[in-house]
Curated annotation (Swiss-Prot):
<feature type="domain" description="S1 motif">
    <location>
        <begin position="629"/>
        <end position="698"/>
    </location>
</feature>
<dbReference type="GO" id="GO:0006396">
    <property type="term" value="P:RNA processing"/>
</dbReference>
<protein>
    <recommendedName>
        <fullName>Polyribonucleotide nucleotidyltransferase</fullName>
        <ecNumber>2.7.7.8</ecNumber>
    </recommendedName>
</protein>
<dbReference type="Pfam" id="PF01138">
    <property type="entry name" value="RNase_PH"/>
</dbReference>
<dbReference type="GO" id="GO:0000287">
    <property type="term" value="F:magnesium ion binding"/>
</dbReference>
<dbReference type="GO" id="GO:0005829">
    <property type="term" value="C:cytosol"/>
</dbReference>
<dbReference type="InterPro" id="IPR036612">
    <property type="entry name" value="KH_dom_type_1_sf"/>
</dbReference>
<dbReference type="Pfam" id="PF00013">
    <property type="entry name" value="KH_1"/>
</dbReference>
<dbReference type="InterPro" id="IPR036456">
    <property type="entry name" value="PNPase_PH_RNA-bd_sf"/>
</dbReference>
<dbReference type="InterPro" id="IPR015847">
    <property type="entry name" value="ExoRNase_PH_dom2"/>
</dbReference>
<dbReference type="InterPro" id="IPR020568">
    <property type="entry name" value="Ribosomal_Su5_D2-typ_SF"/>
</dbReference>
<dbReference type="GO" id="GO:0006402">
    <property type="term" value="P:mRNA catabolic process"/>
</dbReference>
<dbReference type="InterPro" id="IPR001247">
    <property type="entry name" value="ExoRNase_PH_dom1"/>
</dbReference>
<keyword id="KW-0460">Magnesium</keyword>
<dbReference type="InterPro" id="IPR027408">
    <property type="entry name" value="PNPase/RNase_PH_dom_sf"/>
</dbReference>
<dbReference type="InterPro" id="IPR004087">
    <property type="entry name" value="KH_dom"/>
</dbReference>
<keyword id="KW-0963">Cytoplasm</keyword>
Length: 747
């Protein structure tokens, strides 16, 4: 057996060392590379089937990102103590890795390719997401799989007014930008970003700076290819029967143009499909039975190619789109809010034949989503879920758990609203939004952004500004011509070269997603796309503002009311009680949900205003800082010969000495009060250290102050700190000691 050859290359990146290593792990994979950056370490593998998939009319690429809990020194929390289905975070990282790689495989390549990225070590400093892209690209680059890469990737932040490459994870909460850019040495391929209302020129500058570093990372991968690369498999693209296309084009004449130029998607699709079947019938009529299936496939492919060319020719040569719009035109928009009863907020956004209904639900802080993945355990108080049922495109499909696309679209819309949400101090609610795609003809994710903004305002959430989103497309020609399209629909997304989604306020960008279907786009195209996107976004915002321009002043009557209290953190234990008994008792008595933060913030949530006030009173009574001079209405809970104990708050009693019960001399405590009586008392002393409380009923009867009673009772031990046993039991006008206290007799 030959000795294993291990090859490694490194570069300095943002003050840390980025290392790529091949040859140590997974030797049976077509390509395997370990990426290390700081102490974050990933293994990326690439494997391709030996033969193309016969039934595939698409490129069968699968990318999986495997989060292993050992990478963060954790044991999985499930019953089986084993990793289960991928988390949303893992799915989003897999999609992020897939998107820049997919355009770089040869046209017509149909071999199955599987990329698996496995986390070996996570240091909580260096984000693994861009490293997954680098590792996957490097594994493909050194393999024998046909690939037009490599691809570099970096994270870009904007902190203290400066663009920063690969900021450390603890610094990201202070960043106004969280952007991942990926590209080859020649062009940008993918961008994913969330931002705090940043201007378009700054976003473009961040992309450009990030891409410059991507070029260096591509050089590093090429160096590894020189050391460890394998010869590429020979791949010959399937031949294109141009004579068949020409024959179909001549037979069709102008009929294809007439079929696809209808503003209604359903009519257009029906006409196009009918024409396609007519073409197939005509050009397979004389085909022998044994060759019929292959001939049908060839005619179908030729027709689709003609459709592709016709749509693109219309746009490039005449600026004409299939629904009659110009390149910058936006489809008709319809907006409604408050449609659905009992939900806390709703917004219906319709743009052309894309329609999304977004519904908002407000909950207590206890309903925040807990995230326990490879990162630090955190919670999420704003949650957005996107649903794409089959009826939205007139299809029949089995319903099941959310698909990767659904999770990705939901995350994009969620990220696009984060910049305008109120802080927890301003608005302590947990917010869950669900976008139901009711009809789809392109750009449903951006319709979800618009619907989310509408639903939040309808729910009375005090967002800083409305947010809208628009999807931009691109058509490029072989002669270098190109056109950017505003508000693309399904056919333009399918047949175009770019899907560039931009969300934001009137002030700036809050969300961004760029996917390219060619080998990249130039900075000039991106600059034009940003400009057109801003123009389109402002137009949509005007339409939205005409219906609802600011949050409603009142919450829905069906939404819980949350009251925030601030207590001394030292009182948290008293509020919770042993095993949570006390706080559960408040919930059982009032029906209110009580949530307690470590800093002493207490959230009381319930739709019932009276119950809320009752819960507030109980919490305040439990956590009230008792001070000398305070007056309480308390219940007598114990009577002794020397006085009575009065309950001031749950778990907190004080003692009224017999001399403080009444104005005159009291021989018997029960001559004045009985067990269960409620009496008004004043705090006249608190014993340091123990916190025992001395009370006086007499002070309230005579109009004296606590200071007066302490001065009068100096001889009885009522010093500044109060007397023993939580109250005074000495001196004054008491009777003999035997009347005051019963002592056990010694035997």
């Amino acid at each position: 057996m030959s000795e294993r050859q291990i090859h490694s290359v490194s570069m300095e990146l943002a003050g840390r060392t980025l290392t790529l290593e091949a040859g140590r792990f997974a030797e049976q994979a077509n390509g395997a590379v370990v990426v290390r950056y700081g102490d974050t370490m990933l293994l990326a593998t690439a494997v391709a089937s030996k033969e193309p998939r016969a039934d595939a009319d698409f490129f069968p690429l699968t990318v999986d990102y495997e989060e292993k809990m050992y990478a963060a020194g954790k044991i999985p929390g499930s019953f089986f103590k084993r990793e289960g289905k991928p988390t949303d975070s893992a799915i989003l990282t897999a999609r992020l890795t897939d998107r820049p790689l997919r355009p770089l495989f040869p046209e017509g390549y149909r071999n199955e390719v599987q990329i698996i990225v496995t986390t070996f070590s996570i240091d909580m400093v260096n984000d693994p997401a861009p490293l997954a892209i680098i590792g996957a690209s490097a594994a493909l680059a050194i393999s024998d799989i046909p690939f037009l890469g490599p691809v570099g990737a970096v994270q870009v932040g904007y902190i203290d007014g400066k663009v920063q490459i690969n900021p450390e994870m603890p610094d990201m909460p202070n960043s106004d930008l969280d952007l991942v850019v990926a590209g080859t040495k020649d062009a940008v391929l993918m961008v994913e970003a969330g931002a705090k209302e940043l201007p378009e020129d700054l976003m473009l500058e961040a992309i450009i700076q990030g891409h410059q570093v991507c070029k260096q990372i591509c050089d590093l991968q090429n160096e590894l290819v020189r050391l460890a690369g394998r010869p590429k498999r020979e791949f010959v693209p399937p031949p294109v029967d141009t004579s068949l296309e020409e024959a179909i084009q001549q037979w069709l004449g102008n009929r294809l143009y007439e079929a696809i130029t209808d503003p209604n998607k359903m009519v257009r699709d029906a006409q196009t499909e009918a024409l396609k079947q007519e073409v197939i019938a005509h050009f397979t009529a004389d085909e022998p039975e044994e060759e019929l299936e292959a001939r049908i496939a060839a005619v179908s492919t030729a027709f689709e190619n003609l459709l592709y060319e016709e749509v693109r020719r219309m746009i490039l040569e005449r600026g004409e789109r299939v629904d009659g719009r110009g390149p910058k035109d936006i489809r008709p928009i319809s907006i409604e809010v408050g449609l659905i009863p009992r939900v806390h907020g709703s917004g219906l956004f319709t743009r052309g034949q894309t329609q999304v209904l977004t519904l908002a639900t407000l909950g207590s802080p206890a309903e925040e989503q807990r995230l326990d993945d490879l990162g630090i355990e955190t919670t999420k108080r704003y949650i957005h879920h996107y649903n794409f049922p089959p009826f939205s495109t007139g299809e029949v499909r089995r319903l099941g758990s959310p698909r990767r696309r659904d999770i990705g679209h939901g995350a994009l819309a969620e990220r696009s609203l984060l910049a305008v949400l109120p802080s927890k101090e301003e608005f302590p609610y947990t917010m869950r939004l669900v976008s139901e795609t009711l009809s789809s003809n392109g750009s449903s994710s951006m319709a979800s952004v618009c619907g989310s903004s509408l639903a939040l305002m309808d729910a009375g959430v005090p967002i800083k500004a409305p947010v809208a989103g628009v999807a931009m497309g691109l058509i490029t020609g072989k002669d270098g011509r190109w056109r950017v399209l505003t508000d693309i629909q399904g056919i333009e997304d399918h047949l175009g070269d770019m899907d560039f989604k931009v969300a934001g306020t009137a002030k700036g960008v809050t969300g961004l997603q760029l996917d390219i279907k060619t080998t990249g786009i130039t900075y000039e195209i991106m600059r034009e796309a940003f400009a057109q996107a801003r123009e389109g976004r402002l137009y949509i915002l005007d339409k939205m503002n005409a219906v609802i321009s600011e949050p409603r002043k009142e919450l829905s009557p069906y939404a819980p009311r949350i009251i925030t209290l601030q207590i001394n953190p030292e009182k948290i234990g008293a509020l919770i009680g042993p095993g949570g008994k006390t706080v559960r008792g408040i919930t059982e008595a009032t029906g209110a949900q009580i949530d307690i933060e470590e800093d002493g913030r207490v959230y009381i949530s319930t739709p019932d205003a009276a119950a809320a006030q009752q819960a507030v009173a109980m919490v305040e009574a439990l956590t009230r800082e008792i001070k000398v001079g305070d007056i309480f209405l308390g219940k007598v809970v114990r009577i002794m010969p020397f006085g009575a104990f009065v309950n001031l708050a749950p778990g907190k009693d004080g003692m009224v000495h017999v001399s403080e019960l009444d104005v005159g001399r009291v021989e018997n405590v029960e001559d004045v009060i009985k067990m269960g009586d409620e009496i008004n008392v004043m705090v006249i002393g608190i014993e340091p250290g123990t916190g025992k409380v001395s009370l006086s009923r007499r002070a309230l009867l005579t109009g004296e102050t606590a200071e007066d009673r302490r001065a009068a009772g100096a001889g009885r031990g009522l010093r500044d700190g109060g007397g023993r046993s939580g109250g005074s039991d000495r001196g004054g006008d008491r009777g003999p000691r035997g009347d005051d206290r019963q002592r056990p007799r010694r035997r």
